[in-house]
Amino acid sequence: MKQFILLQVVFLIGLSATSQKPCSRPEFRQFDFWIGEWEAFAPNGNKGGDSKISIILDSCVILEEWTSANAQQGLIYSGKSFNMYNAATHQWQQTWVDNTGNTTEFLRGEGKDGKIIYYADKVVDAKGKNFIRRLTFTKLDNDKVRQLGERSDDGGKTWTTEYDLEYRRKK
């Protein structure tokens, strides 16, 4: 009987220790400005798509669900990203997956001053060429976020814009 009571006490102590949300510290909350439902627009005003951003896994992961506004070659492009702050490396990370079979792993990222900047160091394009991808999210105000995707073919010395989107919160 004593062993049973001791086991229950140990279980309850462990439960109370884990009941504190491990991802509630400020560094985990740096990207919360992106949570919500959005329409994304290119600089020319054309709608690029819709994105739903939610918080999952006990507030440890930010999930993006993207759907393009228009079909290309009969396919409506869609994808998901999983964004998280890695407590061990003190870096933001993103894994992007889409319905064309592509993935991108952004294993380095930092958050500060209303920005999250990711880097994917090992990206290969359709021609088999390696390059670096940089992805920057900037909070413009409470209802607007800029997402800028860039690539570098020279190890990060110069950058070329791949896309530039302004996310506008759906009302």
Segment roles from a protein language model:
Residues 1-22:
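Bacterial Sec-dependent N-terminal signal peptides
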